[in-house]
């Protein structure tokens, strides 16, 4: 509460009043807070307080009040609410009044008596500021809170590894006032001079960048006496540093002052104030009203509304804050005019009335306003000061607000960073006994300050023609990606890769691509691959912000297809800080790309106390990229392979930690090993037992060891034209080179298949490759029942090709049914050993049959979605098996089902996350249902009913019988593409890299190829030519390497 002080320009007794706690008046060492002149003729009606014969009265509310008579002279009075009133000596008239100001204003009457009274309506209360004869109190020193209100991030928010979520910054943050650290537009050199003049490590300031208008820089003096500059991106009212989002620069300062380090072990400590106050925000005023278009980021406004401009976007659009409503959004520049620096900075605030008289302010409050309404206008008594007008039940009171030299505002002896802070304070605290500030009286007759001759018709027509498609300048790439949120949630968001400023910006949707949901400054990031094992889904990658000393914070993304994910990764890598140090080479230079293959084999003698279900986490440097499955026991065997391709150039080691699988959201790392890549001989596999170290005390227990096979390779890629002769030899229609490589590359079959497929796809010869290899496989097979059962180069190529081209078909055929299974709580369990007590197997069977009917129907209807080239290859398979086994009438059906169902549809049903059909793991009921559905669909595709092996599944047999004929028709129809279709799609592959990789395979197996060339008659000439070209390419590569070294 605050005692209202009477104010007049006439003489009379003086009263000092202050709201808040700990104020003191009347001491020569601590001057009075304020003085109030009271009219000599003021009527007083209350019990008199004898002895107040002199003019000095000081009142403080809450806390201790101290008054020394030396300053005010005889008759000084200290009044304190809720505290002690103490008077210094010097006169017998000194009195301590503990009740001063309880019922209203403490007022001294003309007779020298003191009265407690509520002021009449005719009286206006206004405190006097610095002009009243006493200097203002200096502002209290800024004291950062000791741990209070800083907030913590819940460990449970990151279930799958280190993760940064922009929501995590929404915690209470405190920072010094803006005027203590904001310097406006300032160049780098002057900023460094100001910090060095301050002379304290931990000193900082924020400035607007002189190189990038609209963005800011945090300049910081480190303990090493080095000034570091950190880029801050301002975007639509938010501020981003690295990838962290803050709603204000003050929040950013608070975060790096109290929550996180800016450099290792260093926080923001000492703000450096500018030499003089800075107010450089661009302001504009509406010259016409506007109503927003629904479902956009536009804002509606009135004529006369004032705006702060945050961002100037393309095509005349601006992102602003409406000072009247505090609403942020889009406006177009045609509807506004510039506001000059000479206009009051509070113009546009809903409570500010800069162009009305004192009498008009009274009239507004009494006619338009209600009790507890208020407004602020410039003071008539003291230019530069302000008056807060406030309506009570009986009168209108006013309080003087005085700006201070250090950009604060004083009212009633308290100091605030802004007038808005004063208003917020007295919305919560009583300004007068029993009263709080409530609604401001809005600005009336706004038209009077504007040019009424503006013709809006043409302006509105111009706005309708404007589009919002060009808010961002240099859009290198755009589209949808999945982004991982808190826990295990993934959300489909719209992304823009902005090339001019190296920013990845994301939005809720393409329709609302104005104010970002988030922004990542790629100049301080690196892109890392994410293995499928980490989240149980494919096509993932991560952006790691690495600029600051704090633990890396990470953004995870997933593409719908491998090609989409790879395309985004390559696009992002071109703008990442670490990639800029090694730009793409020209056609006459050698490119180098590194990769790492890890085989986590087994562990030995893990501590029994700590491990029952151990698994491994794999890190590149300190960034997690993969994990193994959990295995039981102290000597677990994993035998899992992990391939990390195109490593960022800063990767210099891999780390493997061992954790124990529990039901906790995140299992701690217990043991670890670390290996520098420089230890590995490039291109050669190593097989080694690594002794493990411990993150926790093991108390004399040996930590055990881990067997890892690793191969680190550095690909040297020459310009594409250097491989032209090599490519011609590979693409010969007889495929002699392909056959030879399949013979010698048994261990590298998957790698060989992926390289060959990309090369032939690039040349639009994938049908030649697949049909020829399939025909060869069929011709070499004697038993129809074992055709394509073994894993060969042909079957591996077919599987890879289907996954690469048939994703749309899989989603169309399966997604709806699988989503229903995920949502359903109804079991389909038929096995007696797995049924719950009192569970009705007939209900479960009915539910399973309903799912199967719907799913199979969708599959049958999706045949036209399969790519025509794939269907042509199926047709070639059917013709080949008919020619090989003319009397086997089911073979043409089963050869296609073996690929479509066994290697595509059923794997997608069993593991829908791996096909990006779902993002979350299925519940135990849903997982079991998926297994039963896959079993049933596979048997239908094989045209086989369930029998004695799984008798509990016999209830599905009627469904299989009734759909056999339709299945045969469906599979036959898939192959009904007799001619190879023309395709306009061009596969986006790095052909020179694939050719270089194939060349490295030839080099690695050159001895086997040489032996083979001496054995095979028809292929002998081709293989000897292959060996000669391989040797020639090796020599050219050495020449390029020498040239690069010279440069």
Curated annotation (Swiss-Prot):
Origin species: Homo sapiens
GO biological process terms on file: blood vessel morphogenesis; ephrin receptor signaling pathway; intracellular signal transduction; mitotic cytokinesis; negative regulation of apoptotic process; negative regulation of cell adhesion; negative regulation of cell-matrix adhesion; negative regulation of neuron apoptotic process
Tissue expression remark: In placental villi, detected only in the trophoblast layer (cytotrophoblast and syncytiotrophoblast). Not detected in stromal, endothelial or Hofbauer cells (at protein level).
Domain C2: 577-690
GO cellular component, as recorded: cytoplasm; cytosol; plasma membrane; ruffle
Lineage of source species: Eukaryota, Metazoa, Chordata, Craniata, Vertebrata
Gene: RASA1
Subcellular compartments: Cytoplasm
Modified residues (Phosphoserine): 831
PROSITE patterns linked to this entry: C2, PH_DOMAIN, RAS_GTPASE_ACTIV_1, RAS_GTPASE_ACTIV_2, SH2, SH3
Protein name (Swiss-Prot/TrEMBL): Ras GTPase-activating protein 1
Domain SH3: 279-341
Subunit structure: Interacts with SQSTM1. Interacts with SPSB1; the interaction does not promote degradation. Interacts with CAV2 (tyrosine phosphorylated form). Directly interacts with NCK1. Interacts with PDGFRB (tyrosine phosphorylated). Interacts (via SH2 domain) with the 'Tyr-9' phosphorylated form of PDPK1. Interacts with tyrosine-phosphorylated EPHB4.
Keywords assigned: Acetylation, Cytoplasm, Disease variant, GTPase activation, Phosphoprotein, Repeat, SH2 domain, SH3 domain, Tumor suppressor
Pathology noted in the entry: Mutations in the SH2 domain of RASA seem to be oncogenic and cause basal cell carcinomas. Capillary malformation-arteriovenous malformation 1: A disorder characterized by atypical capillary malformations that are multiple, small, round to oval in shape and pinkish red in color. These capillary malformations are associated with either arteriovenous malformation, arteriovenous fistula, or Parkes Weber syndrome. CMAVM1 inheritance is autosomal dominant.
GO MF, one annotated term: signaling receptor binding
Tagged with keyword Phosphoprotein: yes
